[in-house]
Amino acid sequence: MVQRVGIDFGTTNSLISVITRAGLAKCFDDTGRPHPSVVRYEGEQVICGKKARDKLEKLGIGVLGNTVRGPKKLLGSEHINVDGRIMTPVEVIADYIKYLVADADDSDIDQIADLTRAVVTIPVALDGRGRQTLREAMLNAGVYVETFVHEPLAALYGYFKDQPNTRDVLAYYDGKMVLVFDWGGGTLDLTLCKIVNGSIVQVLNRGNNLVGGDYLDDAILSHVTDEHARKFGWSAESKLPANPGMRAKLITQCEQAKITLSTRDKTNIFLPNYFQGTDEESEIDIWLTRETLESICNRLINQGIDEIDSLLDKADVDPQTLALCLATGGMVNMPVIKNKLTEKFGVSALHISEKGDRIISEGAAWIAHDNLELALAKPFELAEARNSLLTVIHEGTRLPQRGESIQKQQSMYCSDPRDGKAIFIFKRPQMVQKSAAADPRTNYGSLVVEVNPDFPPLEERIELTITIDDNLILHARAMAEDFREPAAEEYYDLEFSLVVKKAADDSSEKKNRLRQVVNKSGPAQLFVRANVTNDKDRWDTVPGELLREYNAKYVYLQKPMTRVQSEEDVRYQPCSGCGAKWKKNCCTTGSVTG
């Protein structure tokens, strides 16, 4: 029986893995290393991987003449100009995936891999458009994406599967917080997770694509060429040009020097005939020490550490309380980064993966092999008028796979239509398993729907439709039945849980409505209040001054005022003594309107 594969499509390197019949992870790599994510076009010929990287003549990520380095970075682009040829990211990525699949097919001697179906990993910050583009490119390359999985989540599951008994390890970490991050060539991706009843549940995600190792390689190359120029007293005008194709060779040596300095104090970078000159001036011969390397990368490393601190601060988690910090990616092998991580998390919690360039791909392959499902980690909530919360999609809801979608519909009513707008505010709890009314929330965003301002409160119905598609994008659409002007928003920053062990569903714990107690701590600020409710009889959600107007207009349909509504109404009444609006001690009569 053939197995679905896991694909790690990375900015710098990419890899396909599969789980063999013996229960072992097999990687279809390039002589022990992942395939460089590089595509080169020479006429009608498409060259990918190491051969394309070795022909690079320019530095950087993106389109470099007739070569695309890191096509993943182009997922948000409409079109790209590759040496005069107008192409789309879909075309370039499809060409590269075809190369990966063909190489894996040639290496799959035992015919164990179903290379047409895959679990594909994505960065935590990849938006909806990027996911759609990636799925289309995979399909054009003959690969059906069964589901997308965040890269750190796949890495964590790969780590657990490497342990002698996965279930025992999950049981040990049950109820504990785990941080996993992938600090590779292109990005730094972080995921804070909690192990809950055998499932790996995401608490908070964060990503940064400006602190990857590729930027460090470029910085090392600049340092080396600058040192060579100083060595021979070159100025900007007298500096010799580099020979064609030599920059790619030097960047490879800089990358290797970075790896070597993880275990040694110094290394030599030697490359003959780099410059168009004679004798020693033409050859690069520079010694690079670990101390120098650390000074070169100090700013970039500090930015990465700041990203970790920001995520933990936002989640209100002390790094010393983490049960495990799993660090993957090539950058974490640098001694200076190891030391900073050890100081922050402690020796017992920190685990630096020895297979940092393979663990994400292997984790995706294990997810495919074990037929794991993704579920919603936190409830998707709608804020109602008076700050109550309506759970639209419950936590633990199974998320769609290829060709599937889930849809929820809800009828709502506008409690205050005077400005012609119904405001939908979508929220989620900040922490998993903490969805009580007083627990802190994080906003997804808001959706504003045009309504008829002349309608009485709670009369015009608004139909809200929430859909999650197989790209794990949430689509919120709403339309008022009188104005019939549709409004829509998309949210891609959902948090997932990887359901390793299915827990019994206790439906008694699921509550359709929660009362939110507004947290008034912190600085005073302006905020938008929702003005919708799903209950047509919730007259307590109507603003007091508006309810007074309604009662005066519809004498035989009057509704009783609550204490809160009465206070609201009073605030908008002028002083009985001087006629002033809301103001304390506004006149000599002693009348107080506040």
Give the location of each predicted region.
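Oxyanion-binding/catalytic loops of NTP- or PPi-dependent enzymes
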Residues: 1-72, 81, 108-571, 575-581, ...
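Conserved glycine-centered beta->alpha loop in an early N-terminal alpha/beta scaffold
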Residues: 84
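Short, acidic loop-to-helix structural element flanking the phosphoryl-transfer center
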Residues: 90-106, 307-308
